[in-house]
């Protein structure tokens, strides 16, 4: 059994260069992303009983972002101090995400893998998908 849909991977691979264009095809996602991040942070704060501001809120948290695409969730989590691993089945998405995070001086471990291929002994505090 696999979670990989080859047509979906190809569709997002074809759009890979658009991920960080706020006026491009992912414009609605960029507009929605701040709300999505706030929602995720609210759930994390609630689950882990965290309080305080955002500065280093996620310090020492291990986060796995499954289907990370261009890194639109991975990057904000890393900015908040998390150790982020982003995986995506599209090699092109991983290249775009890696270049963008390097450009922004963020340490994110991006891997071109599916969840089944990850086979990690590492434990994650938070898994996003």
Regions found by a protein language model. Name each.
Residues 128:
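A conserved beta-strand element that flanks and buttresses the S-adenosyl-L-methionine
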Residues 59-67:
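Conserved class I S-adenosyl-L-methionine
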Residues 1-26:
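N-terminal, positively charged/glycine-rich alpha-helical extensions of SAM-dependent methyltransferases
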Residues 64, 72-117:
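Class I SAM-dependent methyltransferase SAM/SAH-binding core
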